[in-house]
Amino acid sequence: MNATKAPGGIKPKHQRLVLLVIALVALIGAGLLAAYALSNQASYFYVPNDLVKNPPEQGRAIRLGGMVQKGSLKTRADGITIDFVVGDGKARVPVRYTGITPDLFVEGSGVVAEGRMEGQTFVADNLLAKHDENYVPRQMGDMTKAQAEAVVAETK
């Protein structure tokens, strides 16, 4: 029995097998590259107690979540840099942020700060203010309950 060979001297059955192996190796390689890239971009979430007990390496991007401690919010002379303390009832972490703060960012409110540790201070690049289920946007604050319900009904 004499099998026909493809133009390159490889049997068609073996040629398909070689192509399958090459495709599989390329797919695995792409998956490993994607996993490596994502692991370097991931921001781990910490609460102050976890951050104090097990700090990440300096300069690693993380998220810090907790409550802005009352009496800790201070604005620097430049007018856009603020210092405050984030706590979780067990530990406190000083935070520095330069930029415009979210409207809901006030002392005693929840916050998620994205940034990195520099020494003992967390330097935030971004602030996300958290609110409770009773939040009412500033624009809706002057509306009556019936008007607010009508607006909500329109969005459903």
UniProtKB/Swiss-Prot annotation:
Periplasmic side: 38-156
Highest taxon of source: Bacteria
Gene3D superfamilies: Nucleic acid-binding proteins
Subcellular location: Cell inner membrane
Alphabetized UniProt keyword annotations: Cell inner membrane, Cell membrane, Cytochrome c-type biogenesis, Heme, Iron, Membrane, Metal-binding, Signal-anchor, Transmembrane, Transmembrane helix
Single Gene Ontology MF annotation: metal ion binding
Annotated Pfam families: CcmE (PF03100)
Leader peptide range in chain numbering: none
NCBIfam families from the UniProt entry: PRK13254.1-1, PRK13254.1-5
Role noted for this protein: Heme chaperone required for the biogenesis of c-type cytochromes. Transiently binds heme delivered by CcmC and transfers the heme to apo-cytochromes in a process facilitated by CcmF and CcmH.
Name the record gives this protein: Cytochrome c-type biogenesis protein CcmE
Source species: Novosphingobium aromaticivorans (strain ATCC 700278 / DSM 12444 / CCUG 56034 / CIP 105152 / NBRC 16084 / F199)
Gene encoding the protein: ccmE
